[in-house]
Amino acid sequence: MRPTGTVSSAETPELPVPRGPLSAGVVEALRDGTPPAPHDDADPYGQDLQLALYCLYELHYRGFRGVEPEREWDPGLLALRRELELAFLTALRDDIPVGHDVEAELRGLLVETPDAWGATHHLRRDGRLWQLREYVTHRSLYHLKEADPQAWVIPRLSGAAKACFVTIEHDEYGAGRPERMHSHLFAVMMRALGVDDRYGAHLDVVPAETLAEVNLMSMCGLHRSLRGALLGQFATVELTSSPGSDRLVRAMRRLGCGPEATDFYAEHVEADAVHEQLVRRGVLGPLLTAEPELATDVVFGVRAAIHLAGRLEALLLERWARGESSLLAQARSGA
């Protein structure tokens, strides 16, 4: 029986422009059904592999315009995705030291050194409107589907950890109010800043560093064996986002942005401060009591999230320091 389910074309992005032979093979396979080319030792952090992997993961979200929904489970595409995942995961494990002490790792996330400096520090003090728009463009690839990658872990949890995690996700999805869904608030902010808020609209302009952060979430969410790493990634965001969100609110106010622009990050200043305790005590505590062998994976998730975030932060600061765009191809606008 042929599947009849469809996704509205209004919610489905166009296939991106390839960035090398690997992503070209994936795009061609999605467009006309040809078998995908095998993995050819592409740079695991590079533009080509990260875009190819992102496209394969996107089949599990909203897909692409003109691509049949059942391609999500195409055996050839799944086999290629597994090759690319292994290359990416191996690179991460090679670059990230092993750790076992989850509580020490989380305590470290709560301390921001006086000399800490990142993109949100720059935007608060010196950032210009075009840089703020670029930052939002980078973040849109995740925040327009905020909480979706993490939702895959729900059936892989049990007991108190599951109940508490669902409570946090309930908040992310607006607590029953669609107008308060975090993905919706982000789209409202994008429009207020004059940035295209269509889902997937910026896939062609964000670099591999941006794609890798989202790919980490998708990879960990889709693999039960990586559920500990997914929760480590999730904890990292929840424990570290409040100060950065506050800096972004201040940056927007300094640049004259109104409440429609600031609402998303203002919401995260308060919500993530509450979520911090829920993640530590309500999710990770019960999880590690029941499955202490997952501690190493949780630490890996924390460190992988920090590692990839650091790569993107370095790119942003380097390009902005030179007065250059951090996007691959974007006409800069605004003061």
Give residue ranges: language-model regions.
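Non-heme di-metal
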Residues: 1-335
